[in-house]
């Protein structure tokens, strides 16, 4: 966000309705010359979170690609967007929230698909011994969160629902790893966090769930792409192939989660049983979906909510950042089939 390592005062640039009269959101796929489909010399630089895409693609048997993949581990959406903006990544992923700040900064990034993910692992936790039973009890308390991420958004909405705002709490912006350490030391009374760190806080330290992100988040997690890569015909073809493989991998994981959990555990060191517990309590199955009007409207609604909550100081129009040139990846023959 400034990405979240910088102060809000540096996020003042508004996204103008014109990210350009001609945007990638309205262009079709680049056209390959006849016979120019050899991808053997293409390298896709893909951002992965620990235990996610890299582990998923390998475990599902989708790793034999006609192009080379160079995995780069970056563990929040802000870092993915910063790397794409700096032309250090071709693909990444994250939530709709980093994407809002990218829009406001006119970052060189596009959103080309959405992953549907579990929202019950997006949690607002209280320490087991803290006098906190509901969100309203957070007033005056030390509450950790990760700026410009889903935790920033759903915590803002939960506070507003309880008649509070960030001004009513002692909000502490921490990375997930630093937040877990702070929770362990007793430096936080509550923590808004996502993923396996929330599970670790519950299992290791007896943290209690006050609320989840279900009902506050859309469940859409965009796939981020480098517009320079989208414009290159060979890279566009490789990205389209990767999206097909990724969708098959997610569908495979829905029916083979134990195998996926083992692959995740190898990277994260989170016990397989803990990952299975998260899965068993999921709000939805995995899926990868094409961009449609509902996706764009949902993202704009998040932007408008952030503006109303005072997190953004001006309107952001997100539609110009959504690219629909990969729609054929979701209609390709056999795309919905899981690998054997």
Model-flagged regions — what are they?
Residues 34-165, 170-173, 189-195, 210, ...:
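Short, glycine-/small- and polar/acidic-enriched structural segments
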Residues 233-313:
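Secondary-structure end/capping motifs
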Residues 1-9, 17-26:
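N-terminal secretory signal peptides
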Residues 97, 178-267:
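Pocket-lining segment of extracytoplasmic ligand-binding domains
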Residues 304-340:
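Conserved C-terminal helix/tail region of periplasmic/extracytoplasmic solute-binding proteins
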Residues 28-30:
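N-terminal signal peptide c-region/cleavage motif recognized by signal peptidases
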Residues 73, 77, 117, 148, ...:
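Solvent-exposed, acidic/flexible segments
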Residues 82, 86, 136, 153-157, ...:
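Solvent-exposed, polar/charged alpha-helical surfaces in well-ordered, non-transmembrane soluble domains
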């Amino acid at each position: 966000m400034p990405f979240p390592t910088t102060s809000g005062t540096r996020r003042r640039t508004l996204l103008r309705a014109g990210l350009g009269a001609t945007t990638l959101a309205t262009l079709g796929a680049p056209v390959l010359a006849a016979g120019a489909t050899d991808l053997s010399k293409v390298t896709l630089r893909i951002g992965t979170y620990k235990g996610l895409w890299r582990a998923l693609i390998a475990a599902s048997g989708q790793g034999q690609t006609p192009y080379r993949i160079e995995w780069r581990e970056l563990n929040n959406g802000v870092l993915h967007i910063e790397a794409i903006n700096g032309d250090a990544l071709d693909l990444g992923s994250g939530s709709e929230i980093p994407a809002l700040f990218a829009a406001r900064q006119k970052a060189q990034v596009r959103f080309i698909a959405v992953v549907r993910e579990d929202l019950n692992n997006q949690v607002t936790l209280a320490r087991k011994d803290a006098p906190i039973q509901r969100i309203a009890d957070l007033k005056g308390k030390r509450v950790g969160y990760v700026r410009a991420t889903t935790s920033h958004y759903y915590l803002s909405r939960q506070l507003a629902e309880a008649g509070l705002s960030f001004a009513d709490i002692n909000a502490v912006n921490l990375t997930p790893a630093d937040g877990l350490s702070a929770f362990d030391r007793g430096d936080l009374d509550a923590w808004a966090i996502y993923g396996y760190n929330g599970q670790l806080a519950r299992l290791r330290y007896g943290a209690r769930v006050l609320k989840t992100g279900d009902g506050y988040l859309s469940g859409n997690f965009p796939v981020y792409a480098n517009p320079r890569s989208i414009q290159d015909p060979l890279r566009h073809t490789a990205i389209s192939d990767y999206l097909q493989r990724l969708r098959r991998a997610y569908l495979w994981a829905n029916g083979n989660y134990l195998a996926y959990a083992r692959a995740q555990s190898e990277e994260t060191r989170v016990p397989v049983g803990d990952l299975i517990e998260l899965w068993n309590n999921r709000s939805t199955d995995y899926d990868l979906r094409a961009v449609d009007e509902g996706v764009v409207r949902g993202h704009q609604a998040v932007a408008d909510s952030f503006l109303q909550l005072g997190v953004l100081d001006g309107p952001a129009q997100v539609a110009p950042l959504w690219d629909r040139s990969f729609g054929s990846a979701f209609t390709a023959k056999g795309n919905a089939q899981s690998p054997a």
